[in-house]
Design a protein with these regions (language model features):
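Ribonuclease/tRNase effector modules and their secretory precursors
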Residues: 1-91
Length: 91
């Protein structure tokens, strides 16, 4: 089970239309992941394309000692969906 900040989840729901727990199932499936090194966050952050709620989602998360912590999630844009389906055509 992934951890998340409930206030951040509410903010994510307002901004992107989905609460953070809605993306959690993507952590259990195939994901395209890269490190987000665009800023100095003080911890290693990842951006992943995964499958949750019947669609491709984009998650920002960090891997902590007690497991993954979700930072944000949203439905993938068209170019991101194409990249995911190229990597995982059986989806």
């Amino acid at each position: 089970m992934a951890a998340f900040d409930p206030k951040k989840s509410d903010k994510n729901l307002r901004k992107h239309g989905m609460p953070l727990p809605a993306c959690e199932e993507a952590l259990d499936g195939p994901m395209l992941t890269y490190e987000d090194a665009s800023e100095e966050y003080g911890e290693q952050r990842f951006v992943s394309l995964g499958w949750a709620q019947g669609k491709v989602v984009v998650m920002v998360w960090t891997d902590r000692a007690d497991g993954p912590r979700l930072i944000s999630c949203r439905e993938a844009e068209r170019h991101e969906q194409k990249a995911y389906f190229r990597a995982y055509p059986s989806r």
